[in-house]
Amino acid sequence: MTRLTLALDVMGGDFGPSVTVPAALQALNSNSQLTLLLVGDPDAITPLLAKADFEQRSRLQIIPAQSVIASDARPAQAIRSSRGSSMRVALELVKEGRAQACVSAGNTGALMGLAKLLLKPIEGIERPALVTVLPHQQKGKTVVLDLGANVDCDSTMLVQFAVMGAVLAEEVVGIANPRVALLNIGEEEMKGLGSIRDAAAVLKTLPSLNYIGYLEANELLTGKTDVLVCDGFTGNVTLKTMEGVVRMFLSLLKSQGEGKKRSWWLLLLKRWLQKSLARRFSHLNPDQYNGACLLGLRGSVIKSHGAANQRAFSVAIEQAVQAVQRQIPQRIAARLESLYPAGFELPESDSDVNARQQSGTNGHD
């Protein structure tokens, strides 16, 4: 295995270094070829490394940062005042080639804006999207994007997300001819926002894409599609709702019947069922798939949940390792170039044409 280096914004997230630094040590224990650059306040980081052994310390380096971007900061203001922040320094390490990927649990809007500014999107991609791979009930996986990088998405962005998601599903997840669907409020063609209907009209014209139509949110975990595309607002709400339900379900499995007097054989049966069901649905535990890749950039950036615990943040680090090892940005770019050798120019939807005509322009910006 080739050695690789990741830059961690250890100050980001709800818990900062108290979670991210122990998660970094956990990741080092799991991967002997990994080197981590811990970006943040040395005074906050150093005490948390007291239990690190010599071998771990040899693969750690603290990179000082002067400030932290607040989780509630407005993205535009955060970007303007980002110099010296742990998030920006971590991204700059990737830009300079000192790290191969960045992991942050910080402000999503700021991470999106800074990553786009510093690392640049792949040729032809308008805006990157947050993507994750979710397990479904058929024991397979579904690629879902956008999960919050872009609150408002026009039809062109949705189409680009669909193409990138399909490439990711085929090249990285290993799904041949992946099925692609748009998340909508119904399966009928006339349902949904204009941007969704316009995106559907364009996707139907792409021979390289296996577009299957609309999918409703209650079918997210059924395995009916391999790629599910939506705007960032809808995707974020859908994902967090699903995670909340799964956490509640797993919690109920553990607590069901506590405090009640039962015969010994009923207690044994209850515990057996709890363990059996917990094993059956453990793959749905949100901690096991924490870490969304900012897809569409020339470098690898992983966004962890802000509320991630140690285990979940270590999973996000592993996601970054896989993104580097699988060369996701390079493979996405190469596949797009092979599919669209004349440039990633997609057919315009009716609303895009009307908007361009109303603005008096004759082409794309």
UniProtKB/Swiss-Prot annotation:
Reaction equations catalysed: a fatty acyl-[ACP] + phosphate = an acyl phosphate + holo-[ACP]
Presence of the UniProt keyword Lipid metabolism in the record: yes
GO terms (BP aspect): fatty acid biosynthetic process; phospholipid biosynthetic process
Database matches in SUPFAM superfamilies: Isocitrate/Isopropylmalate dehydrogenase-like (SSF53659)
Keyword terms: Cytoplasm, Lipid biosynthesis, Lipid metabolism, Phospholipid biosynthesis, Phospholipid metabolism, Transferase
A GO cellular component entry from the record: cytoplasm
Single GO MF annotation: phosphate:acyl-[acyl carrier protein] acyltransferase activity
Annotated family: Belongs to the PlsX family.
Subunit structure, interactors included: Homodimer. Probably interacts with PlsY.
Function: Catalyzes the reversible formation of acyl-phosphate (acyl-PO(4)) from acyl-[acyl-carrier-protein] (acyl-ACP). This enzyme utilizes acyl-ACP as fatty acyl donor, but not acyl-CoA.
Protein name (record): Phosphate acyltransferase
